[in-house]
Curated annotation (Swiss-Prot):
PROSITE patterns: HTH_LACI_1 (PS00356), HTH_LACI_2 (PS50932)
Gene3D superfamilies in UniProt: 3.40.50.2300, lambda repressor-like DNA-binding domains
HTH lacI-type domain: residues covered: 1-57
Pfam family, one: Peripla_BP_3
Protein task: Global transcriptional regulator of carbon catabolite repression (CCR) and carbon catabolite activation (CCA), which ensures optimal energy usage under diverse conditions.
SUPFAM superfamilies reported in the protein's UniProt record: lambda repressor-like DNA-binding domains, Periplasmic binding protein-like I
CDD domains hit by this protein: HTH_LacI, PBP1_CcpA
Record keywords: Activator, DNA-binding, Repressor, Transcription, Transcription regulation
Protein's name according to its UniProt entry: Catabolite control protein A
DNA-binding region location: 5-24
Species of origin: Priestia megaterium
Amino acid sequence: MNVTIYDVAREASVSMATVSRVVNGNPNVKPSTRKKVLETIERLGYRPNAVARGLASKKTTTVGVIIPDISNIFYAELARGIEDIATMYKYNIILSNSDQNQDKELHLLNNMLGKQVDGIIFMSGNVTEEHVEELKKSPVPVVLAASIESTNQIPSVTIDYEQAAFDAVQSLIDSGHKNIAFVSGTLEEPINHAKKVKGYKRALTESGLPVRDSYIVEGDYTYDSGIEAVEKLLEEDEKPTAIFVGTDEMALGVIHGAQDRGLNVPNDLEIIGFDNTRLSTMVRPQLTSVVQPMYDIGAVAMRLLTKYMNKETVDSSIVQLPHRIEFRQSTK
């Protein structure tokens, strides 16, 4: 049977209000009374109900995190950053997996609010106008992590994805490549069509190189789609000599697909990935990759959310963290 605040009050011979003050750390309790209540709580095994406490304090010290795919290394690292900062500031986490499904994302958002969370960290590859309208209506603060929305109405923590793509392609151009392909994630997602593709094209254009539509191949973030993409690119009359890939997992597929065709990476084909996940060091040759600081994005997003929840001063609601390229053996 669950022990209630009433049971604690009765056993300790104090009022329920006194038990509540002790549980919530209110200093207006005599030390002897506090000691007696805490001993009773320990003896009975009482566990305060966060939601019930929230009804009184209007805070549950709980944060909702909506994540597209917890099995993905990228999002798992983000979640670690979120949780570490949440723990530091004494918040609990409710984590929900949306499977990158818009209807499920909106359902989870409303579900989180029903649990009376104090704030929400939201991640999605495709933040639509409908998302923005729902997020704006949220009664608690919301911060986007590694997710973009074009209006900048929702606070967010990201990197400059367009510039990161530009830098990756520019490094291949600087190595002498003229035939550079791009294997993208799902093109309907703004992070790809509005950012990474734009950076890829800008690097080529500014260097006076042609932009070939056939050199832009859409994948679905999986290893298999990387294999399929490189097979398609190697059918081109003028084959690419370098490929920029939108994620590390697809890049592994590109490397293995090229090797299956008898090509040597990097002598015949140089490859750069994106995200610098652990996968980049698990392949041979090891993968050169754009470093997106996943843990830091999660940590900074959680810290930004704590500022909003506690009504602290926020210098900027749109935070962009620095990126860099980690050069390994898939490039010369």
